[in-house]
């Protein structure tokens, strides 16, 4: 996404970068504008924050874009090439707030600062401008500043590579969070590309421009919008990839890192190169790249991920999502790890059960868990502090975060020692044990209790840590007392009680007396020798002495030396911390793991969740299942308790394929909630969480699909029904016998018979071809007869009661089939006018009477399984109908008398009557 300045992207008559870089432009530019053009030409894909005094100013198209995005005034500054120069600006002191807004909108920003003193510029000549250069590239996927990051969310930069070899191209993804050092790789495929990208949720995706402009992949990048950023294809060169990665890590070979495909190496090297570019060759403390297998995580297609509202609701809010309902973590790292587990549920029962073991152990020991959570609350975000220190952007508080995090880890290790732990918690304890205690001791001995934000402010090294520093501080801090003593001495020598020693930035320290008292200072030779005149004011005179000048030098040198010693100490401690990066990150991950397990244990106790049995079977048996989000919402509202319902999609005895429930029932009866809750229970179980049920036995699901909700896609010319059919097609083409499929109201967006036919065929396909576990909710009650033909299909219904013409929704699922949808009752509850409701009842009665006389189900009941049914219009056509058509075609009304026309009409009627 080059938002900026190609001619095709101009706003009105604003000059593009290409225009600005032309010879004509450069030859007429002022020195300042020439400097701007040169820097802008090297940063075409970024908004340029150009430092001018106390403001960052933006010009030309950058100004137009930024003013619109930030809601700030667009003004102008002079002209260039006969056109006014659009300009806007933001104060330097508030720049981070504006950067945060731009980054959230997907922009990239190049921050340009003065890199020399104005005095140096003057030495080069009168027209020389102060040198400026880009000191920071801020992009959505490469930020590290706390103010620009969400503590509970990862901030991934992702690279997509494609290698053409053989008949099918190979795809791979690499994703890096430079704020925490995470670096992972995975192969993918075109068919699952969007699903894998959305699973990771990168803030920025770089990819070759050739891939970005591939029309076959256009739908993927349309969904991603500004997240997808094309880069030159050479950045993804697989031939040089291994060498680039090796150089970054300072190793001769990647053999010790594991085995990677060409596509994975291409993606990884592109990501690393982009990080180096944006960090201006500074290297964050990235971990060794870890390879993920696609088969190790539950595949959730994009529509399902959105419809189930895992991390965000359909409106984009975190409130109301499953993640919000599950999150009981007390650390930033724990919150990020919980989100990662939710977005990438496992398919390996052994790994899942290790997580469940930890939750069970902590749930069984509530006092221990409470103590651990209290200790965790004192743990700052060590990985992000470490990253800032490694990039040279850290401050004293980042060192303090490492110190406090290590202290919390030591406290938790003491709690864990001697306890009987799960495998996962034992590994976490061992990782914490690997922390360098000597480093913590040095941090404790060095850092003050109260730490400033910026290292240039000083005061972060504790008293007693450095003898010279203590001496210089004493001189600096006692200067006021020394100056006061000197002032008293001069008052006594001169007899001038109003004499004062003052200080300003021009004269430094000076003696000030009134004009009337000045004679006492300079009327004698001794006075003139001792008191040196500095300045005459209207009502006062100012002097200095050799003694005062020497004291001033000592005080100034002491302050400078204090800051120099503190900065030296900071650099030493930073190097020591970064040298232990791997141990610190391992301990931080251990703390996050404990936090997630403890949080889920608290959740299980609080919400009465149970441990699911997870194995490699094809079972799916839920007793007393509840919707985790809806249940908590009802409790907050003090409403009626959630009605629990069971669900058993396990293969019937002797069968290998999963069972399908065909769910019928009224509108507002709870069908959609029931469908979603079972999908969410499967996700929670496989992420390694207890589940909202009285009992649950789940054979791992490899793919989860849902078709619930209805929306159109106008941007791509798709109606609601077309979107529904595309999603249904993906399910029928991709679901396996280990998949879980939930379908809601397939076929409702078209004519009744068309929709019924599609729903019928889809159910058959799921049963006979996919052989998956599934829930299929429908208002096509005719489908319930399929239970007589399909051995693994059962009918279930949402129960209701009728009372005095009203319907009471029980929200209970039971065996059987509904024969009514109670749509008119729901319409009345929604507030439709009484006249409309009454008319609807009359029409419904007539339609139901007609259906009883000639039920459409008679035709459907006779449909053979998986054979092409004769079209309804062909089945309804009598053998003589075509002859009648031929006779009708042969008639020429213009050549017929009225009598002949009447005879012909009777003849046609007779043919039709004899069908």
UniProtKB/Swiss-Prot annotation:
GO terms for cellular component: cytosol. The gene is mutS. This is DNA mismatch repair protein MutS. It holds the Pfam family MutS_III. ATP binds at residues 665-672. One of its GO terms (biological process) is mismatch repair. Belongs to the DNA mismatch repair MutS family. It comes from the Bacteria. GO terms for molecular function: ATP binding; ATP-dependent DNA damage sensor activity; damaged DNA binding; mismatched DNA binding.
């Amino acid at each position: 996404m080059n938002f900026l300045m190609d001619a095709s992207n101009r706003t009105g008559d604003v000059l593009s970068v290409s225009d600005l870089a032309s010879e004509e432009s450069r030859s007429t530019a002022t020195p300042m504008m020439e400097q701007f053009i040169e820097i802008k030409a090297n940063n075409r894909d970024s908004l340029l924050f150009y430092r001018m005094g106390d403001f960052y100013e933006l010009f030309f198209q950058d100004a137009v874009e930024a003013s619109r995005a930030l809601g700030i005034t667009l003004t102008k500054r002079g002209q260039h090439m006969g056109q006014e120069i659009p300009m806007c600006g933001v104060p330097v002191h508030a720049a981070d707030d504006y950067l945060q807004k731009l980054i959230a909108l997907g922009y990239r920003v190049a921050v340009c600062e003065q890199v020399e003193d104005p005095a140096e510029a003057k030495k080069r000549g009168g027209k020389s401008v102060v040198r400026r250069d880009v000191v920071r590239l801020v992009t959505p996927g490469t930020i590290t500043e706390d103010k620009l990051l969400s503590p509970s969310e990862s901030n991934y930069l992702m690279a997509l590579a494609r290698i053409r070899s053989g008949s099918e191209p190979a795809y791979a993804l690499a994703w890096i969070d430079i704020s925490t050092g995470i670096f992972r790789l995975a192969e993918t495929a075109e068919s699952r590309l969007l699903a894998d990208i959305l699973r990771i949720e990168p803030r920025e995706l770089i990819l070759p421009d050739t891939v970005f402009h591939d029309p076959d992949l256009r739908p993927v990048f349309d969904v991603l919008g500004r997240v997808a950023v094309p880069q030159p294809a050479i950045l993804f060169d697989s031939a040089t990839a291994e060498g680039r990665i090796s150089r970054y890590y300072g190793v001769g070979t990647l053999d010790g890192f594991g085995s990677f495909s060409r596509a994975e190496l291409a993606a990884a090297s592109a990501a690393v190169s982009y990080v180096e570019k944006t960090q201006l060759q500074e290297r964050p403390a990235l971990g060794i790249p870890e390879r993920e297998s696609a088969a190790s995580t539950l595949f959730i297609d994009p529509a399902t991920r959105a419809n189930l509202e895992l991390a965000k609701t359909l409106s984009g809010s975190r409130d109301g999502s499953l993640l919000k309902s599950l999150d009981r973590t007390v650390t930033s790292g724990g919150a990020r790890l919980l989100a990662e587990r939710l977005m990438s549920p496992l398919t390996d029962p052994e790994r899942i059960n290790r997580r469940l073991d930890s939750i069970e152990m902590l749930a069984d020991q509530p006092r221990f868990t409470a103590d651990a959570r209290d200790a965790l609350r004192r743990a700052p975000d060590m990985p992000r502090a470490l990253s800032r220190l490694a990039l040279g952007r850290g401050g004293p508080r980042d060192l303090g975060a490492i110190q406090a995090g290590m202290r919390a880890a030591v406290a938790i290790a003491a709690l864990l020692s001697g306890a009987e732990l799960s495998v996962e918690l034992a590994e976490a304890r061992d990782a914490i044990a690997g922390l360098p205690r000597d480093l913590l001791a040095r941090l404790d001995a060095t850092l003050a209790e109260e730490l400033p934000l910026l290292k240039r402010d000083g005061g972060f090294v504790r008293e007693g840590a450095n003898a010279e520093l203590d001496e210089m501080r004493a001189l600096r801090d006692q200067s006021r007392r020394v100056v006061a003593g000197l002032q008293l001495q001069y008052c006594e020598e001169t007899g001038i009680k109003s004499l004062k020693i003052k200080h300003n930035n021009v004269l430094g320290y000076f003696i000030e007396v009134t004009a009337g008292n000045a004679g006492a200072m300079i009327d004698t030779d001794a006075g003139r020798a001792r008191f040196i005149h500095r300045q005459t004011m209207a009502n006062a005179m100012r002097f200095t002495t050799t003694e005062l000048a020497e004291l001033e030098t000592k005080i100034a040198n002491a302050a400078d030396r204090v800051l120099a010693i503190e900065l030296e100490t900071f650099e030493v401690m930073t190097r020591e911390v970064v040298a232990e990066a791997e141990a610190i990150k391992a301990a931080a991950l251990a703390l996050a793991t404990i936090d997630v397990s403890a949080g889920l244990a608290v959740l299980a106790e609080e919400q009465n969740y149970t441990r699911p049995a997870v194995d490699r079977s094809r079972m799916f048996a839920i007793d007393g299942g509840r919707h985790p989000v809806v249940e908590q919402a009802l409790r907050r509202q003090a409403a009626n308790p959630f009605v629990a319902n069971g669900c058993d999609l396990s293969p019937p005895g002797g069968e290998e394929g999963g069972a399908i429930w065909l769910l019928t029932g009224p509108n507002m009866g709870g069908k959609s909630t029931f469908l979603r809750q079972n999908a969410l229970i499967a996700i929670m179980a496989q992420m390694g969480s207890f589940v909202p049920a009285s009992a649950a036995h789940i054979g791992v699901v490899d793919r989860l699909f849902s078709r619930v909700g209805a929306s159109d896609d106008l941007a791509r010319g798709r109606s609601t029904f077309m979107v529904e059919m595309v999603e249904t097609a993906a399910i029928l083409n991709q679901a396996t016998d280990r998949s879980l499929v939930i379908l809601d109201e397939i076929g409702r967006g078209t004519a009744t018979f068309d929709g019924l036919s599609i729903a019928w065929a889809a159910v058959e396909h799921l049963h006979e071809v996919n052989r998956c576990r599934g829930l299929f909710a429908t208002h096509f009650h005719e489908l319930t007869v399929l239970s007589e033909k399909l051995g693994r299909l059962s009918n279930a219904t949402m129960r209701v009661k009728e009372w005095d013409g009203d319907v009471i929704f029980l929200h209970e699922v039971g065996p059987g089939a509904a024969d009514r949808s109670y749509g008119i009752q729901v319409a009345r509850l929604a507030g439709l006018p009484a006249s409309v409701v009454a008319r609807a009842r009359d029409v419904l009665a007539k339609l139901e009477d007609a259906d009883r006389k000639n039920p459409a189900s008679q035709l459907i009941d006779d449909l053979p399984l998986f054979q092409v049914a004769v079209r309804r219009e062909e089945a309804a056509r009598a053998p003589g109908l075509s002859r009648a058509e031929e006779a009708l075609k042969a008639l020429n009304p213009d050549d017929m008398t009225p009598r002949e026309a009447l005879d012909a009409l009777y003849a046609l009627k007779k043919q039709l009557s004899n069908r």
